[in-house]
């Protein structure tokens, strides 16, 4: 009875939703990327219902588009791209994951994941490399023109420690879970579900901190 009285408070709030990854990239020339997996984490002490919505449902097949995640567990959601055509290159689609408590209908929280179809991974890498070079040249020119040793301003961007922690959390989420038999990764690098839940929670906090800077 005490838990039922707390449900309206949960409904009124904006419950953080932990999903990895937050971006899906499909490559037309690599069929292995046409099927990707979203992992929904539930670090809470109550079960969550989830529902996956999409801005262009005719382009994708979502396996288990609705279901439930037990407390302190995770759920893999398989997404397949079924309309790989050149006219869709570069178009940004969005998936929205809505979660609610099992006894409630109103969404407690939501998370958006963007999806993009690109022609080739090699072309994407080339474009990213060219972009990085241009950004590096622009930054170098800016510092050469405006650098003043006696009156430098402190950067408001994320610290190296924050970036390092984010990389560690992302790496932890990408490592296999305990019980994955087919993985080639050594067993001592397999993490438990609880460890991944902690990593997802910390990554969420870091992301919010970065957006506030």
Curated annotation (Swiss-Prot):
It is a multi-pass membrane protein. It comes from the Eukaryota. Keywords: Endoplasmic reticulum, Golgi apparatus, Membrane, Transmembrane, Transmembrane helix. The chain crosses the membrane at residues 159-179, 191-211. One of its GO terms (cellular component) is nucleus. One of its GO terms (biological process) is positive regulation of transcription by RNA polymerase II. It is found in: Endoplasmic reticulum membrane; Golgi apparatus membrane. Pfam families: Motile_Sperm. The keyword Membrane applies. Its main location: endoplasmic reticulum. Residues 16-143 form the MSP domain. A motif (Nuclear export signal) lies at residues 205-208. Plays a role in differentiation and/or proliferation of mesenchymal stem cells. Proposed to be involved in epithelial-to-mesenchymal transition (EMT). However, another study suggests that it is not required for EMT or stem cell self-renewal and acts during later stages of differentiation. This is Motile sperm domain-containing protein 1. The gene is MOSPD1.
């Amino acid at each position: 009875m005490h838990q039922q009285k707390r449900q309206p408070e949960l409904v009124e709030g904006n419950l953080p939703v932990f999903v990895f990854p937050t971006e899906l990239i499909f490559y037309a020339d690599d069929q292995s990327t046409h099927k990707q997996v979203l992992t929904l984490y539930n670090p809470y002490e109550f079960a969550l219902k989830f529902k996956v919505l999409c801005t262009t449902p005719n382009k994708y097949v979502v396996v288990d588009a609705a279901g439930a995640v037990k407390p302190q567990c995770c759920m893999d959601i398989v997404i397949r791209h079924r309309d790989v055509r050149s006219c869709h290159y570069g178009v940004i689609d969005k998936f929205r994951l809505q979660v609610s408590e099992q006894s409630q209908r109103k969404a407690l929280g939501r998370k958006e994941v963007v999806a993009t179809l690109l022609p080739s991974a090699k072309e994407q890498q080339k474009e990213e490399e060219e972009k990085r070079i241009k950004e590096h040249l622009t930054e170098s020119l800016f510092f050469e023109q405006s650098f003043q040793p006696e009156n430098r301003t402190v950067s408001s961007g994320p610290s190296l420690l924050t970036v390092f922690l984010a990389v560690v959390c992302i790496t932890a989420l990408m490592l296999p879970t305990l019980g994955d038999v087919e993985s080639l990764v050594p067993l001592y690098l397999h993490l438990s579900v609880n460890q991944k839940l902690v990593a997802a929670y910390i990554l969420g906090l870091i992301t919010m901190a970065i957006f506030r800077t």
